[in-house]
Each structure stands twice: as C-alpha cells, then as structure tokens.
Amino acid sequence: MARHDEAKAGGLFDRIGNFVVRWPLIVIGCWIAVAAALTLLLPTLQAQAAKREQAPLPPGAPSMVLQKEMSAAFQEKIETSALLLVLLTNENGLGPADEAVYRKLIENLRADTQDKISVQDFLAVPEMKELLASKDNKAWNLPITFAGDAASPETQAAFKRVAAIVKQTVAGTSLTVHLSGPIATVADLTELGEKDVRIIEIGTAVSVLIILILVYRNLVTMLVPLATIGASVVTAQGTLSGLAEFGLAVNMQAIVFMSAVMIGAGTDYAVFLISRYHDYVRHGEKSDMAVKKALMSIGKVITASAATVAVTFLAMVFTKLEVFSAVGPAIAVAITVSLLGAVTLLPAILTLTGRRGWIKPRRDLTSRMWRRSGVRIVRRSTIHLVGSLIVLVALAGCTLLIRFNYDDLKTVPQHVESVKGYEAMNRHFPMNAMTPMVLFIKSPRDLRTPGALADIEMMSREIAELPNIVMVRGLTRPNGEPLKETKVSFQAGEVGGKLDEATTLLEEHGGELDQLTGGAHQLADALAQIRNEINGAVASSSGIVNTLQAMMDLMGGDKTIRQLENASQYVGRMRALGDNLSGTVTDAEQIATWASPMVNALNSSPVCNSDPACRTSRAQLAAIVQAQDDGLLRSIRALAVTLQQTQEYQTLARTVSTLDGQLKQVVSTLKAVDGLPTKLAQMQQGANALADGSAALAAGVQELVDQVKKMGSGLNEAADFLLGIKRDADKPSMAGFNIPPQIFSRDEFKKGAQIFLSADGHAARYFVQSALNPATTEAMDQVNDILRVADSARPNTELEDATIGLAGVPTALRDIRDYYNSDMKFIVIATIVIVFLILVILLRALVAPIYLIGSVLISYLSALGIGTLVFQLILGQEMHWSLPGLSFILLVAIGADYNMLLISRIRDESPHGIRIGVIRTVGSTGGVITSAGLIFAASMFGLVGASINTMAQAGFTIGIGIVLDTFLVRTVTVPALTTMIGRANWWPSELGRDPSTPPTKADRWLRRVKGHRRKAPIPAPKPPHTKVVRNTNGHASKAATKSVPNGKPADLAEGNGEYLIDHLRRHSLPLFGYAAMPAYDVVDGVSKPNGDGAHIGKEPVDHLLGHSLPLFGLAGLPSYDRWDDTSIGEPAVGHAGSKPDAKLST
C-alpha cells in the first residue's frame, strides 16, 4: 500500500473511525431506530408519490399561460379535474339493445351519490352526438369528469368504484367496454410502478448477491454490503417521505430510479471500503485498526464520489421540467444517505464481524492479470489509446441516428387496459377528434363585426389548407367548412335568383305594363276634366266667399237683427246661395276623395319631384285634401243646407235666429281658415298645372314601360351570371365570405358565439384537427407552421393588433421539447463544472481533470450509441426524450467515481514514476473497479425488467455505459493517456514539476512549515511491506528498519533529505535507502487468515518490482536513466546495452 495513499491521522474520518470502532452497537442501534421511526411515523414513499400527479410542464410554460388566458377570457373556472373516457363498442354495429344498456349505465352512474362525477350524455344533449358517436356506428364515447387530481388517493378510489359500476352494467351484453383517459392511465402507471419496484429490488439484490459471492467468496462478507444498503434504502425512503410532506416532489419514476441507484452506489462504496480493509488486514493490521485506517484512507474518495453524484443531481432542482427536478433531489438525498451508511453503519458492522473473524480476506485471484494488463498498456500506450478511442468514437457516432419519442403511451405495455382503450378509440374515431388544438385569438377590438369575422375566416381557411390539417371548426365554420349562407357566391346566387324571378314576372306581366300605359293616359284625360270642374267650383266658391264676407259685414259690428228684418228682399237670394254652396261643396268633396291617394303617389314619384309644374299641382291637391280633413267643407255644406231650408212662411225672426247661429259658425271657420280666397285661387292654378303635368306623366309612363321591357333581357343575363357563381360556390377560392349584420341577432349565431366567442367579444377560439399523431415531432413542427400562417394573415386586417396562440397536446409537447433542450444544456454544463471542480480539489491539478472529463463524455456518448443500436435499430423503439438527461448525469457521475479512485491512486504512486505508478494502480484497483462496476451495472440492468419502457431503456443504457467505462475507459483509455502525458498530469502542483530541478528555498521552507504543522493523534501507519518480509523458509517475519548512509532511519532521512531520497528512489539499482519506497505489492497474493504472516504460493517475479533490493528478476528489463521518464520497453536513447525488443519479465 503506497505511503502517499495511507491513512493520515487527524481529520473528520479519524474522529468518525474512533467513534465507530469504540461504540459500534450504538451506531447500529441508531440506524435501526431511525429507519424504524421513519417507517412507522410517515406514509410510504409510494403513497406520497400517489398524492399528486406529475406536472408535465412548469406553470410559466407558454402553453400553460395560454390555457389560463383562454380560461379567463371565456370565464371558465380552472378547477382540478380528472377525465375518464368510457368507450362502448360493438363491432357488429350499435343497435336499440345497446342504446338500452347505455341508458341503464347513465342511470346507474347518476345514482352514484358517493362520488362527485359529471357525465356527458349525448342522448340528453343531441348536439354532442356528432362528437361522441363514431361515424361507423360501432362506438360510443362516454366522458366522465371527476373532481380532484387524477393521482390523488380520493380520486383513484372514486375511479375504482365508477369502473366497477361500468363493468357490472355492461357485463353480459353485446357491448365491450374500454376505460382510458388520464385517470385510467395514472391508475395503470401506479400499479405498474409498485410491481416494478418490488421486482427490480429483488432482481437487483439477487444479481448483486451473485457478484459479491464471486468477489469475496465469503457469505458474511457478501451480506455486509446488503445489510448496509437495506438500512440505507429504508432510511432514504423515509427521509424522502418526510420531505414530501414539506413539498418535495416525488413520483414513481424517481422511486424506481432511486432504488437502483442506491443499490449500485451503496454497493460500490462498500466494495471500496471492504477492499481497503482487506488490504490492511493482509498486511498485519488488527481488525479494528484496519477498519479505522480503511475509513481514513478511502473515506475522502467515497465522500468525493458521493458528493459528485449528489451535488450533480441536486443541481437538477434548477431545471424546469419536473421529470428532472423531481428525480434530482430524490437521488441527491438517497446518495447522501448511502454515504452516511457507508462511513458509519458499514464500519460498525465490519468492526463487529471482523472481531469474530467472519470477514477475513480471501486470496486475490485477479491482481496478476490486471498487473500484466497495466504492463501491456504502459508498454504500448499509444496503440491502446488509439484503439480504444476508435471503438468509443464509432459507438458514439451512432447517436447521430437517434430519434426521440414523446408519446408516453408507447412507454406503457400494450396489454394495459388504458392503452387498449386508446387503441380502440383510434380505430373508431378520427385522430385528435377528442383532443383538437385550439387557436386562440385575443384582440383589443370587438370581434363581433362582419369585417373581423371575415378576417378570422380568411385565417382559418389558410390554416385549413396546410398539409395534414383535417378541419378547422369555429363560429364561421361550425362543421369544418364555411356556412353557405356566409359565402359571397351564395349570396350573389340568391340575388341572381331574385332577379331571375323578377325577369319572369316582367315577362308574365307585360300586358299589365301596357295597361299601365293606357291608365296613365286615362288619368291625364280625367285630370283635364277635373281641372275644368275645379275652375267652375273655384269660381262659385269665390262668389260664396264674397257673399259670406258681405253678410258678415252686414251682420257684424253694431248692426242688429231688427235691421235684417227690414231686408226681406234678401231671402230669395239666400236660398239661391244655399243651392250654389251645396253643389260646390259636393264637387270639392269628390275632388278631395280621389285626390288623397293621388297626392301620396305623387309624393313618392321621382318624375313629379323633378317637374316644377307637377310639384305645384300636387301642393294644390294637398290643400283640398287638407280642407276636407280639417272640416272646412263640412261647415260650408251645413251653411248651404241652412240657406236652402229658408221658407216664405217662416218668420223672419226664426230664420234670422237660425241664420245667426250658422253665420257665427261659418264666420268662426272663416277666421280659422284665413286666406281661403287666396288658397282657392292657388287651388285653381294647381288644378291647371296638374292637368298639364298629367299629360307629361302619361308620356313618362309610356317611356318607363318601354325601358322596363328592355331591362328584362338585361336582368335575365345578370341572373344567369349570378346563378353561375352560386354553382361554383363549393370551390373555396370562388366562395368568398360575407356575414350580414342581421345574422348577429339570430339564435343560431348566439348559440355558437357562446362556444367560440368570449362574452365581451374580444376573444375567439377555433378548433384545429390534425391528421398527425400529436406526440410526434412532425406534429410539434406543425404547431410552428400553424402559428406562422396565422401570423402572416394578421397585417392590414382587423386582427393586426391581436395576439394569437395555439393550445393542445402538440403545443405542450413542443414546450416540453424546448424546455428539455434548455434543461439538457444546463445539466451538461452543471455536471461538467461540478465534476471538474471536485476532481481539481481532489487531485490539486488541472490537466488530469480536463481529460478525465473528456473520457466520461465520450463514454456517455458511446453508451447512448449502443442504446440507439439496440432499441432503435434492432428492437424498433424510439428512445424516450428524457433518457439522455438522466443517463448523462449518472454515467458522468459514476465515471467520475471510478476516475477518482483510479487517478488518486496513480497520483499517490506518481513519486515512484508515472509508468510504475500506472502498473501498480491498474494491478491493485483493477479488481476493485471491475467489481464495483459490475455491481452498479447489475443494479442498472435490473431496470430492464421494468414494465415502463422508459426505465428499461435507461437501465440498459446506463448499465452498458458502466460496463464500457469499467472494462475499456478506466482500464485502457485513461491509463494509456496518463502514461503518455507523464508528470504534466499533476500540473500545477509540485508533483507536476521536473524532478531534476532542485527545490527552491521557498519550496524547502514550505515543506518545513508543513512538517511542523502536521498533526498526528496516532502514529501514521508504516507501509505494510516494511513490516513483513520473506525468509528462505517461506515464513513471514518482522523486518528491521533500514538505514541510509548517514546512519539514520529511512523515514528520518527522507524527512531531512527529501531531495536526496527522491533521487535514490529513481536509481537503477537502489542498494540502500530504497526501503523507504512503499511497495506493498511484495505480499500481494499472501493470505494471512490468522494474522501470523503465513502465506501460500510462491512470489511472482513481477512482484519484485517493489522489492527493496531487486537483485534478480529484473534482468529482462531494459536499462533506464529514470524509471518515470522512459516508458517500459522503450530504452533510453543512447543507453549502452539497450535492446529494442526487451520485455518485462512476467
């Protein structure tokens, strides 16, 4: 055992070792108490994982934000719910008997008052039948919504009760039931996960047990790591369960993965510690001291290894996807618990079993093989390096063929009930019929306008024309096609139809148009006659007015009735006046009767409006009509009747009295109708103008009829043209779009607007159905195409200031892909930085950590390439999208573990020469690294038996990566590269300096300071080979301390003259002082079960490399100037007696 790798007194592990060795039972008791308390007081980790469903995306993902905005715009409550899809099928066709079973099922579900469920029955809502009944009439879909999260225990319990109701109702009928949907998938995954955990743990434990039997060949030694791992797993699960109570996310994937990682890592730590324990026991240490020294020497390596894995996984808490952020902290906690178990519980168990001799080391069977391997690598380092890199690069190149799978259903076994349900649904319903994408349009403008809806329709039409788009449904196209009523071509056809009807009517009523012409002429003649009568009436009326005026003058003022009595000569004239008034009023009333409709007609006549004469006549006729309506003509008629009734035998007083009343009424009316004579004159003039205008009107009517007949042929041509457009309306390019404002008030529009338009009219949503599988990369790329087309349709429209988004399964998976790419970059950078820093701290160098990081990266890519070959090219399975991230962290971290063990040992051996150090390190650590690698690989290969394909792919890829790393990278690539680089590996530390350069004063002063500050609570253990040497009779005995020329012991000489001793170590024949060189390999292969130095077998020649006086066995070696500056098998240039073909004697 190398002196530089020995247990150093002081420090954390010295104190832990003292405590554990002194009170092992207390340590074991504490572990048992903690594990039991966590198990009894907290729920199981599986129960904690079942309480919440893993969120596929973070809340700030674009698709999640869009969903919230859409729910807010349409005033839909975002409630936690779980969907169950009950698919009822009958391959012979659904009939009345099946409908009766369906109705019975609805009744039974609604009778279930224990569970809060909502059933979408298409029989109760006929409009839903188009979506829930298949076109082939062989399947009905019955969606059932549960209140609560799909993964919560309450919801899962409700699901089991509802599933029982469904199966009992359908049993014995012609219907076949399939249960699918998110809640059914979660139930299946939970059941599979629980089974997988047990199977994986048992299978992994058995495989690890077999490997431990082969490694230790001791039943107790084999069981010690398993006991430590078992206690660590129980404690870690309890710890995670407690942390889950405070919000730590855990899921079944994390649990399964954690179990495999803990078994692998915990066994590795145990193998490292037990192997070092066995080394110390072989070299004569008592069991307790061997436990303590093993912990002191290997504790820092185990801690660095665990820190690498734990910190790397803990960094995943900063990732966005929960598949990483949930697994990372769980693995970090599990690795931390494994480390605590390895440095406390395992040493305590080793202390108890070692005191009783139950874990004695067996003879090492592989050291010689690994030593020869190291010799070959050092001798031909370039060939080994190039050969190993060719293999690694070739395998890594296969990653260029990798294709990722985003469909989680493909990762679940096909025999699972929910998967069968999805397959049956895809057989009977179009792809994405139940889960279309949603195009969401939000605008500051009101979209309930013809222009805005036309722009939305234009956008929808362009989207529908994209490849692999089945249909786009929305307000303007509820069935996937624009409503025919909104097509401009349809509307033009409707106009054409009306014009065609008008043309037919014109043709059918041509004779009536001729009658209209004759009627116009007759009207003109009648109006001419009326004019003559009006002129006569006006003349009489003028006389009446004058007479009445005179009568008013005679009877008005201060005249009395007595004066009228003397005017009896007027009686005859009064009777004549009454007769004239009666005739005139009769004529005026007749004129007013027919003039009223004529005035209305002339008011709406454009011909009359443009003719001044007609307008004047129309005004006069309106005055006559107004006189009749006001009662003026009735008053005059009453006066005429009174005058006509005057009799000779009547007394003048009676007549005058009657006349007095009538005259007052007439006078009162005349006062009300002021200017009647003027109006009568105007009426006479109007009648003349009307008669003259009627002749012109008759001529205009004649011309109008002629023009209408000519229009008939033109209307017929227009009708044929518009009807032709209607016939081509089915072509989208010919259809056009127009929605009249009147349609907004229809019930059909209002009903559709509730689904596709928000209440305030500022948001709209359209459903986009794709023909692609939503979980494919093609569907994700299609999302970008849809958004690009939608965005290109916005400029210069009502939607130019609107925001457009797309929600749906492909959109969410596209977000997952984007977040995965971002998380993967973070994981790679964080892992490389963390591993590099830990290697730098451990090795105190910069060069070696750089190429060690490169080695684990190419090892990871090679493992991923092998996984691609096996699963994708051979088994035909696409790799799950989460595999590269999870496998990267674990392979890099585990590779760093073995790097730390290997390179730290080489560094400790480097003072004796890099090449000798590589040979010794490969020989001494080859078996340990191989055992640890096989154990960890076996734990990962245990995941191959998992039901979930994702875990199987991860287990195989990580397992084969560990095997590749163990047998190729750590045993060939890294040793060869280390040999070629030489002392530059350790730059800029002291070990990286040229040994021929004498130390500076500063170097010597620093060494003296370090020597004074060195603390040693216990004596530093001396190299085992200085304690045991071989006698000629084969028995072990204590060796005396050898002295250097100054007479001081070797260790003192080294401390006081380090520079001298360094040169003595590199002497080709160190006859003295070389005893200070640690060469623990002297006793390799010696078994000392009783600790008395007894051994079996003969010393191999190659073991003499570490002998203090190698007088024999080295004849086959070429001569060296310096052991660490010339590769074995390559003699120094110009050295006498060197032979190019010289070989190391084995």
UniProtKB/Swiss-Prot annotation:
Domain of life: Bacteria
Keywords: Cell membrane, Membrane, Transmembrane, Transmembrane helix, Transport
Species this protein is from: Mycobacterium tuberculosis (strain ATCC 25618 / H37Rv)
GO cellular component annotations of the record: cytosol; peptidoglycan-based cell wall; plasma membrane
Transmembrane segments: 25-45, 206-226, 254-274, 298-318, 330-350, 382-402, 826-846, 850-870, 883-903, 928-948, 949-969
Protein name: Probable transport protein MmpL12
Gene3D superfamilies named in the record: Multidrug efflux transporter AcrB transmembrane domain
Residues of the signal peptide: none
Topology with respect to the bilayer: Multi-pass membrane protein
Subcellular localization(s) per the UniProt record: Cell membrane
Family to which the UniProt record says this protein belongs: Belongs to the resistance-nodulation-cell division (RND) (TC 2.A.6) family. MmpL subfamily.
